[in-house]
């Protein structure tokens, strides 16, 4: 039925467990097999394709992804792996020959992926030396510790899947590796063939990317907890050393899975020796621990495959002068796992109002813009006005009567459009607006409304130099500087006396003050008078 949601209202004689139904819907949503249209759950195009593939839906999703994004040969390789995962493992380990079987099987083991290990086996048995007859296959299986029946089932299922893909109009090539071990290695006696010696070169990225489409909720992130010495307080000697070594090894084989699950890589997996930072697996088996089988290193391609299954959080929005825009750090979560961390994103796409505020306050008012654009001289001119105003405030000690950063911010905020959130946006808008109003962004302190009613202060009362006469009767010109900061030892007016003029002046010449500060001088002298 295309209206998949009808199952919840169907009159079953023996109704299924609703949790199982809910889990099924969640799985189909993850695989993009169902969607919502006008409030109803419906089958998607992918869902209708999955319905025609007679294998587990997760494995079917891998086939569809390979057909959609990969080459015909890649699809053929994925079909081999999917068929392998659909059946019982053909590798055998007789109780009396386990070590020998493990050594034989390790020749095929790929340390990065159990999926590629399956392809190595397929290539060696069915391709490298031609398609074997039944008798030849029996001899190979006996020597290689494979089950002849399962190998036949594997081959038959691959043939069936290839035919099914053709019916779905998928182009299927041949599962050939880019390269394989030479004949001289394959013809060596088995006891002379080293571990991993039969590994081929496959399109590992393409294979794993296709398979990840069906395993989004089967990923895991390594969580390393270094053992502490206090964990072994009750042990001594060699027992303590062995326990610490075992704990050290186990600490790296601990993974956080989807929705808070924890698991470890199955010890027999070749990947378990590498303990990669990220893995994906086709099944979880619970014994003494929750083990992951057939795990492979995650290539971190989950985000485009997951789509709406992800949740993105943002932190630390700030202005970036080098980028000319506000940026933030993005973290993308899939079933609680951070598949993307510390990605810089344009804050204007997330919060345009706040991004515009960053542009005006830190980019324009504070002048933190590293890019040049047409007619951008207003930025420096307006900054010069603020710096002059700050110097005037240091002289007059009247902060409220001079323009401030907030005044310039209010000016820009009133004239710059709301959709301008970056230097690039500003440059584009200003280039077209400049011809109509070339002085629009020129800041005029005289138009600041809050200063219109304030009493004007003459800067002539705060001169830059003091002219006096030296003890030798010659004129002396001394520079003056102003600081308005009660916590600064230089607060007030400072006379800069050159060393060569020091002997020509006397302390009595410094009982004066500049006209603008006479009121404060008189007030401080009155306060210094004795109370009685």
Question: Where in this protein do the model-derived segments appear?
Answer:
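Second RecA-like catalytic domain
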Residues: 1-323, 353, 357, 383, ...
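A positional "C-terminalness" feature that preferentially activates on distal terminal regions of long
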Residues: 164, 174-254, 268, 304-532
